From Swiss-Prot:
This is Probable ATP synthase 24 kDa subunit, mitochondrial. Residues 210-222, 229-240 have a biased composition (Basic and acidic residues). Residues 210-240 are annotated as: Disordered. Pfam families: Mt_ATP_synt. Mitochondrial membrane ATP synthase (F(1)F(0) ATP synthase or Complex V) produces ATP from ADP in the presence of a proton gradient across the membrane which is generated by electron transport complexes of the respiratory chain. F-type ATPases consist of two structural domains, F(1) - containing the extramembraneous catalytic core and F(0) - containing the membrane proton channel, linked together by a central stalk and a peripheral stalk. During catalysis, ATP synthesis in the catalytic domain of F(1) is coupled via a rotary mechanism of the central stalk subunits to proton translocation. Residues 1-32 form a transit peptide. It comes from Arabidopsis thaliana (Mouse-ear cress).
Amino acid sequence: MAYASRFLSRSKQLQGGLVILQQQHAIPVRAFAKEAARPTFKGDEMLKGVFFDIKNKFQAAVDILRKEKITLDPEDPAAVKQYANVMKTIRQKADMFSESQRIKHDIDTETQDIPDARAYLLKLQEIRTRRGLTDELGAEAMMFEALEKVEKDIKKPLLRSDKKGMDLLVAEFEKGNKKLGIRKEDLPKYEENLELSMAKAQLDELKSDAVEAMESQKKKEEFQDEEMPDVKSLDIRNFI
């Protein structure tokens, strides 16, 4: 089970839930005590409900990992896709965000009080960098160029409350998207590619952890005569 916990914690989609679960284990919830002398408060019941909700989600994730075969080979597209599908199933069972949903949530919550377009784009840049996303198409540069053009035309900084100015900016974005070959109907494909990219990175980290663990084991005297197995042959289900 220790390996399973470590394995699960490598998934960014699950990290938040697991951290909460660990925190709940550390909190002395008085509602769990068998003392009959004190009344149960609503706050205790709410905390108890949160605890069991997170615990059930964690168990659901472990149950899925007991059934699904995961190959630690980030260079194999089929293995990456399988891992991504397993993580998607876990997210759905545990009612957690996908990477694209998490990014959208970050954007919605962190930009709601930003008044001007430039600060908004800078915040998007910050979120992209923080999430480890690359801008291979150059869309970010295009958006700043579009903003420069609009602000030059209106001769003042563009506020998000300026409907006419924002319409001009959106029109410039659409021109830029067309040049870059970005289409709205392709958004589901971009989201899928993002999930696969994240899955590959996580699978690569899992592989590195497995190799490190085996090499550490190999240094122990009782294992020096044993041949280290190919990491791709490991079956995670055997460790859960």
